[in-house]
């Protein structure tokens, strides 16, 4: 029939679905370690460490060689440099992950640029040459990919506009189709920034508009939902809202918005932390899973909310490696328990309760 796309082979569809299910396994989630060179410079600056390739390799080796990490981490998103990088002892980073049973993934977008004739609304770059890059990434050991799109809320200015939502949905769908054609599970990330003074009900309404558009576009582009994953924001109040929402409210509105818009064929929803403190990111996820069962796994794909305390424990000092790995394991365990709705709170103490919010966050 006309109007239908060419199906991917049963072999590829099976591989995609199996890998997506493995990544969304109960009690596990994703370590997002795909910071660009510029972003990791900001992280290193905060602890007084020079942003050299050697220091980046040491730090990522610290993360990926943590014994037992695979108990709670199913996948790790890498920056392109890291996919081809070796540890200080000469072991490929990909092999460190595989030794723990962790599936390597790759950030494939090329960052954001402003949509012309808009009030600073963003489009994501990187579709040019993506198919060829995906082939190379698969050969290097990657089995999933991530593409970040960004939207902002400003009711007074009508943001996000329909143009912004359409652009985000179209870009994510094209990316996802290209990935699946090249045997990579696409993680679809439409991040609605928390900047603003709006309350949680506004975020819920915008999240539903965005996700409805994204899944319509994925359908239009013949994307196999069983072989894809979603990385959305949680539904929260704006960062400047005078009346912050509780963990229970965040869980209620987030789950409601997902059930209204996300097809149950999708294996998993892997939340971004969006500048929440490490502890809030765990507690909010825990509250959602206490409300289960859900049509899909609700899990995590955290960067700052897994690494912040670990980075501070390391401080760029080689002798602190074991201590930093212990801190990482503590945070990974907390989130693994939260995925099961069994996190009791308190991991990491006061340090884990510190906000990680950055205005107009650029990854």
From Swiss-Prot:
The gene is ald-1. Changing residue 146 to A: Abolishes enzymatic activity. Reduces MIC2 binding. It holds the Pfam family Glycolytic. InterPro entries: Aldolase_I_AS, Aldolase_TIM, FBA_I. GO terms for molecular function: actin binding; fructose-bisphosphate aldolase activity. This is Fructose-bisphosphate aldolase 1. Disruption phenotype: Conditional knockdown results in growth defects. Decreased intracellular ATP levels. Decreased number of trails produced during parasite motility. Decreased ability of parasites to attach to and invade host cells. Pathway: Carbohydrate degradation; glycolysis; D-glyceraldehyde 3-phosphate and glycerone phosphate from D-glucose: step 4/4. D-glyceraldehyde 3-phosphate binds at residues 36, 39, 107, 189. It comes from Toxoplasma gondii.
């Amino acid at each position: 029939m006309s109007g239908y796309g060419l199906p991917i082979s049963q072999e590829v569809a099976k591989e995609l679905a199996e890998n997506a299910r493995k990544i969304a396994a109960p009690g596990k989630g994703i370590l997002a370690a795909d910071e660009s060179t510029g972003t990791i410079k900001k992280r290193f600056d905060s602890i007084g460490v020079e942003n050299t390739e050697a220091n980046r390799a040491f730090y990522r080796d610290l993360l990926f060689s943590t014994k037992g990490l695979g108990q709670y981490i199913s996948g790790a998103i890498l920056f392109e440099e890291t996919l081809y990088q070796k540890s200080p002892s000469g072991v490929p980073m990909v092999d460190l992950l595989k030794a723990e049973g962790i599936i390597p993934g790759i950030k494939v977008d090329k960052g954001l640029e402003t949509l012309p004739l808009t009030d600073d609304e963003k489009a994501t770059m990187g579709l040019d040459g993506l198919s060829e890059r995906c082939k190379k990434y698969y050969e290097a050991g990657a089995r999933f990919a991530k593409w970040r799109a960004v939207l902002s809320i400003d009711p007074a200015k009508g943001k996000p506009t329909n143009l912004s939502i359409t652009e985000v949905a179209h870009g994510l769908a094209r990316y996802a189709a290209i990935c699946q054609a090249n045997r990579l599970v696409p993680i679809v990330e439409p991040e609605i920034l928390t900047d603003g003074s709006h309350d949680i009900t506004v975020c819920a309404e915008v999240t539903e508009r965005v996700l409805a558009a994204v899944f319509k576009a994925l359908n239009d582009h013949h994307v196999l939902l069983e072989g894809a994953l979603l990385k959305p924001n949680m539904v929260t109040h704006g960062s400047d809202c005078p009346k912050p929402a509780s963990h229970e409210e965040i869980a209620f509105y987030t789950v409601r918005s997902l059930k209204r818009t996300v097809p149950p064929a999708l294996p998993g929803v892997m939340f971004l932390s969006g500048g929440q403190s490490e502890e809030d990111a765990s507690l909010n996820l825990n509250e959602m899973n206490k409300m289960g069962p859900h049509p899909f796994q609700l899990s995590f794909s955290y960067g700052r909310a897994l690494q912040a305390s670990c980075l501070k424990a390391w401080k760029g000092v080689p002798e602190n490696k074991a201590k930093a790995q212990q801190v990482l394991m503590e945070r990974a365990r907390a989130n693994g328990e939260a995925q099961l709705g069994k996190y009791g709170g308190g991991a990491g103490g006061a340090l884990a309760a510190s906000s990680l919010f950055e205005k107009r966050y650029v990854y």
